[in-house]
Amino acid sequence: MIRLRVKEVAKEKGFSQGRLSRVANIDENTLKRIYRDPFAIITTETLDKLARALGVPSSELIEDVPDK
């Protein structure tokens, strides 16, 4: 199972949710959903936009967690 680490990385980089939404040019509601649900399904395009905005490789925004 893949877990998104967007919220954690954004916090480490000093990004508020609103600022990240603007810089990444993604809908604020999409980002809210990602923040609420780290297992949300997103497009690779959205993942790439978030990674570029945060200045990290996209691989840093995902984590493989074992199924329970």
Where do the protein language model's features map onto the residues?
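DNA major-groove recognition helix of helix-turn-helix/homeodomain DNA-binding modules
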Residues: 45-60
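Short, charged recognition helix plus adjacent turn
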Residues: 8, 62-68
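Short alpha-helical DNA-recognition segment
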Residues: 15-33
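Helix-turn-helix/winged-helix DNA-binding modules
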Residues: 1, 12, 39-42, 53
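A short, Lys/Arg-rich alpha-helix, primarily the initiator
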Residues: 1-14, 18
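The alpha-helix within a helix-turn-helix
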Residues: 10, 21, 51
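Residue-level detection of the helix-turn-helix DNA-binding "recognition helix"
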Residues: 11, 25, 36-39, 66
